[in-house]
């Protein structure tokens, strides 16, 4: 019998006294959460943000984990000094790790452990603290905030302000729960609208004290406090665009030094609205279908499929990297599609009978019905298609992205969260139409759609990492910003020695969040009430 998820748990991470690996500055740490499923295999679940020049980081990113009472859930927290833009960790300095179980964290509520190196020796005086909270509340708070006349902390130019939100824990300490983006060179900043779960912000208690701090960002990590204020949700939710709630930003040190001190600026809350968000399971149980489409790279760089060196060569036991990636992801996602009929396309090959290069040809060669019956149907279409085509080029992604986007756009005509589209692209390398693909992704970010890219082989995947907006919002060549991060890129070879479920768990990890994010943004509800559906079964 499968384990039943008891609840969801939020994990907050902070570290102290990290090793300093940078010359002339401090380490730029990031924490990676790994999960152990069997034996010695660990797979990456999620990462925090990177904090520059800091040996005592408090990460604002929260890890959300399903808690299974009857399963020993082994976790590993790895801390790395990130000095480059690659997603690989092997080229970053390792600052230490901590292994524990989720049960240990939950039972102690806050667990502090020394960090150790791979050899088991102490990582200097470094330690890690993991705080756990059960998530019981799906209310979120939508904020719009700005400031005016902030103190200038920079000699050359103006302050680069950002906000931090802190809640008070039961032991009286402050825990950071949200950090806004930095607004560069501006004493009257307007921050982008943002949302924080009500539970994260104040444990759902409208009268619990919330502390907001305003800082001037500095590249060297020595961020200057501009000022702070304390409030409650009861006060904050009085805000409206026509009647903002305003707070003086007070710097205590300056107030004590100067009798004439008034404030260090004013923070204005223009919107503070509490709304209830549906969960991923609310949508799935409420009738939302995940529509799965596959795009396979048939460009010449894969090598002649008849040669054992080719990425398209099917080994005597019937597999290659393309098929393994397809099975891994497809087997998970097919359970969320009622008819299990999946369109499958190839790109970058010359196809019969004209032998023209095509970038969105159906692998079953039936343009009016490109659907394959289940994942097995896609595999069969792939196998029969391979000997009938000539691998060619270039590697263009935009046609197949735009193809799926047309269906996603049609689905937006419905007034409920009835359909969401997931495109899996399996490719061996360097993308040719990067500008067109950037534009296609930015356009698709406004649609009920996500894109998974699995890179097979050992090529340079830096362009793929660029499309995966983890380092910041992707922009089109015209400067338009993607309103959501909808691309997840994973190099297949990172999972060669991992359990067969690991690739799917990694690439699909962000899909629930992307589904919920889209439907909640557009205030779309599930087609059917989940409770009603459960009663009928």
From Swiss-Prot:
PROSITE patterns linked: C2 (PS50004)
Domain C2: 1-115, 124-247
Post-translational modification: Phosphorylated on serine and threonine residues.
Cofactor (UniProt): Ca(2+)
Record-linked SMART domains: C2 (SM00239), VWA (SM00327)
Annotated GO MF terms: calcium-dependent phospholipid binding; calcium-dependent protein binding; metal ion binding; protein serine/threonine kinase activity; receptor tyrosine kinase binding; RNA binding
Binding-site residues for Ca(2+) 2, renumbered to this chain: 22, 81, 83, 93
Residues engaged in binding Ca(2+) 1: 22, 28, 81, 83
Tissue: Expressed in breast and weakly in prostate and ovarian tissues. Expressed in neutrophils (at protein level). Widely expressed. Expressed in the brain. Expressed in neutrophil precursors from the bone marrow and peripheral blood. Expressed in primary breast tumors and ovarian endometrioid adenocarcinoma.
Entry-annotated residues carrying Phosphoserine: 14, 197, 243
Domain of life: Eukaryota
Single biological process term from Gene Ontology: positive regulation of cell migration
VWFA domain mapped to chain residues: 291-513
CDD domains, sorted: C2A_Copine, C2B_Copine, vWA_copine_like
Disulphide bond pairs: none
Stated role: Calcium-dependent phospholipid-binding protein that plays a role in ERBB2-mediated tumor cell migration in response to growth factor heregulin stimulation.
Quaternary structure note: Monomer. Interacts with ERBB2 (preferentially with the tyrosine phosphorylated form); this interaction occurs at the cell membrane and is increased in a growth factor heregulin-dependent manner. Interacts with SHC1; this interaction may mediate the binding of CPNE3 with ERBB2. Interacts with RACK1.
Full protein name: Copine-3
Organism of provenance: Homo sapiens
